Amino acid sequence: TGKEIAVRPENGEDRNSKIRLTFRQAVKGATVSLSADGKKFKTHIPAGVHDGQKIRLTGKGKPGRNGGKNGDLYLHITVAEDPKFTLRGRDIIMPLPITVSQAVNGAKVTAKDIDGNEITFKVPAGSSSGAEVRISGKGVVNPHENGDLVGRVEIRVPEHPNLVAKHAAKEFDKACGDFADELARER
C-alpha cells in the first residue's frame, strides 16, 4: 500500500548570545556585527538599552526543518560602565562639580556631554550637593520622548585651601547666621 508519511514542519530552536556594548553605544544605539551558525549579519541595537536587557532577533536562531520557522536569537546585553556618565531610565546622569560661590549665588556652568559637546547647566542659587539640574531632551533619544541630561551638583572646595580661603569660609559661616546650627541639629 502506498501510504505516505506526513512530514510535519519543525520550528528551529531559539539561541542565546551575549554582546558587550560601550556605554555610548547603549545610549545612542549601534549597528553591530553578529554571527550565528557560521552566518554573519548586522543588526541595530536601539538607543537606551540597559545592562542585563534581552533583545529578541526574530528568525535568527536555528533553522526550521520541513518548512518550519527559524528560531529566534536572544541577545543578552552587557553595558560597560562609563567613568563619568550613568543611565537612569532615559536620563543620562553626570557629575556637575561647582564651587561654593556658584552654589550660593547660582551660576551658568559649562560641561561636556557624552558626545564631547559643550553644554550649559543653569544652577539655581542655594543649590546643595546632590541637587539635580536638567537640560531637557538631551538624554537618550527615543521616538516617543527623549530623556534629559541631568547634572548632579557636587560642591567642591580646594584640597589645600590657603589662609585667605579659610578666612573667607569663616566669614561665610558667620554671614549665614544660624545655618550651621540648623545643620548640626540634622546630624
Roles of regions detected by a PLM:
Residues T1-S33, R65, C176-R187:
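Post-J-domain flank of DnaJ/Hsp40 co-chaperones
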Residues A36-R187:
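Intrinsically disordered, low-complexity linker/assembly segments
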